[in-house]
Amino acid sequence: MSIPVRLSFMLLPLLAILIAPTVQSASKVELDARVSATLERLQEHERASVELIQKASGILVFPRVLKAGFGLGGSTGEGSLLVNYQPVQYYRTTSLSIGLQIGGQASSEVVLFMTDDALERFRESDGWEAGVDGSIALITVGVGGDIDTHNLQSPIIGFIFGNQGLMYELSFEGSKFWKIHKE
């Protein structure tokens, strides 16, 4: 197989990721409902998240983040930032990756800004990137099925989960968050 043909096969997932936002774009009302349902689902699956959510200065919720890869990979999703449980701004998350990866999956992502300062820096940015503009401490499940609490003192805490609860082997590193306008 020639290099251009191989390259085009590797770029197909990237094209799908770039096209997906127009396909999955939800109205403001639809997205607000999905955000609310996602937050409820997290609290049902992970009871320890309830107290963290109550203490958070802001909550960034992405109900559905689509990830796909075939050599090159990427992810995208739409969500909103809640302050006092009210949507104040809508966002898109995107990431690109290179490496051995084939397939796709959907997950939900919730980012908790535990301090006013962390929330303010996020809101003032134009294209905030995890691992560059701030670090998101990913919450995982420990040996006994309980949330690993060693990351709970971080100013920004994140959850990545599916229908069965928290997901493993995933990360926020390289994810970029962009403000979007919703009608």
What are these regions (language model features)?
Residues 1-5:
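N-terminal secretory signal peptides that target proteins for export/translocation
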Residues 8-18:
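Bacterial N-terminal signal peptides
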Residues 20-22:
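N-terminal signal peptide c-region/cleavage motif recognized by signal peptidases
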Residues 25-183:
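Small-residue-enriched, tightly packed secondary-structure blocks
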